[in-house]
C-alpha cells in the first residue's frame, strides 16, 4: 500500500495560540511552529499552555526538524519545553532564530540544540520533504511562509501574514505564490485570524503618520508602549523621535532583549545619539524625551504596569505625560488594560489608545488579501488554520465564494489526522493533542483535578480542621481547632465557627463510639457533616481539610 501524507495540527485550530503542525510521510516527519497559548480565566495559577507532544515523542526517530515561520510567542514560545522532550534541528530566519536563542538560553538549551539559519528563497531538504522559505509581511520582521514539497504534492502554509506594499522589509512575495499556483498546489493551510474583516489590513505607515502627528503637537514627555516584537513600530518611534529632536529610552526586559538582538542582526537602525540609558532620563527635558515601554497588554509587573502603580524604579508618572498605547487588546486582556489606563489618568497623564486613534494595525490578512492568496495559489484542497471555529468556518465560506469545491475544504481540529493521497484529502482519526499546563517550573503536573481544587478554593475558600487523637484508645486529646482561609473572617463569625466546632466534635464522638479508628473514615465523616451543615446555613461549599495527629 502506498504511503499517505499526514497533516496533524497539534495546536492552533479552534483556539488562538499554541500553533504547531506535524507533516508526516513514511519514515519522515517535520514540525511547523511550536507556540504557546495563554491560560483561560479558570486556569488558576497556570502561567502558560503548550501543545501535547505525546505523538512526537512516540515518533521521535522520524523527526527531521522544526521549521518556524516567525518569532512571536504563539509560534516559538513552547520550544524550550518541547525540545526537552523531542530534540531536533530548528530552522528559521535570522531574527526568528535570534529570538529563539534568547528563550533557549533561559533554559540552558542553546548548546544542546542545532539552530540553522535560512533566508527567503532557501530550500531545505528534510527527509522526503523540501521546505521552501517565502517572504511575507507580518507585525514582526523576517516572517516567512512555507511551500513544503512532498511526495503527494506541494503544501503551502502561510503562517501569519498580510500584504503591505509599503513595508520596511519589502512586500509579501506574491510572485512566488503565483508561480507555485502555476506549478500546482496540492493544499493550502492559510491564516484565518482576520477573515471576519472586510477589505485590506491597513499599512504600518498609517501608524507612523498617527505617531508623528502626536509627537508634533506634544510639549511634554511621551511614553509609547507597544508589542516588543513589533520592530517596524519601534523603528518608527525612534525615527520620529529623532526627527522631533527627542531622545529615546527603553524599559522592560523583553524590549531590552529584542532591541539588542534586532540591532545586532541589523534589523533595527537606531538614529545616531538617539538612544539613552534609562538612568539618564532625569537630566533630559520633558519635551525632549520619549520612553518606549512594555506593557501594552496590561501584563502584571510589566514596565507600564509598574509606572501606573508607582513601583517603577526609574520612571514616575507625572501630570501631563502623554502615554500612547500603540497596540490593540488581545481578547481577555481588556480588563487589565482598562485598569492601567484608569490608573494613569488618575495620576494626571493623558492616555491615547487605539479606540481613539489609528495607533495600531493588525499583522494579519483581511478578506481581500486572503482572496489574493487563494487566487494566486489555486489549491486543490484547502484547510483553514490559525483561528477559532468561527474563523475557520468563515474562511471556508470565503473559499467557496472563490469557486472552490466544498468537498475539497476540510475543517479540522487540534489533534485531527488529515490523510492525503494524490487524489484525496480526508479526516482520518485523531492523536493525543490536549493542553499541557505550565506552572512555574512544573510542566504537565497541573491537571484537571488540581485545577478543580484551585477553582474550588478560589470560589469558596477552605476550612482546616485540626485534631489530636490518643494513640492508645483513639479518644480526642485536643481540638478540634478550625482555621478559615478565604471562607469567612473568623473574628467576625464566632457563632458560625463555634457551631462548626460542635459539628466536628459530634462527628469525632460518633466515630469513637462506633470504634472507628480508620483515619480515612474519620476524615470523611468530618467532611461530610461539615459540608452538609455549611451548605444548609451559608449556601457555600468550602474545601474542608481534616488534619489528624496521633499522640
Positions of the model-derived regions?
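Conserved hydrophobic residues forming the short capping helix/wall of the S-adenosyl-L-methionine
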Residues: 104, 399, 534
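His/Asp/Glu-rich metal-coordinating catalytic cores
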Residues: 2-67, 72-283, 302-316, 335-339
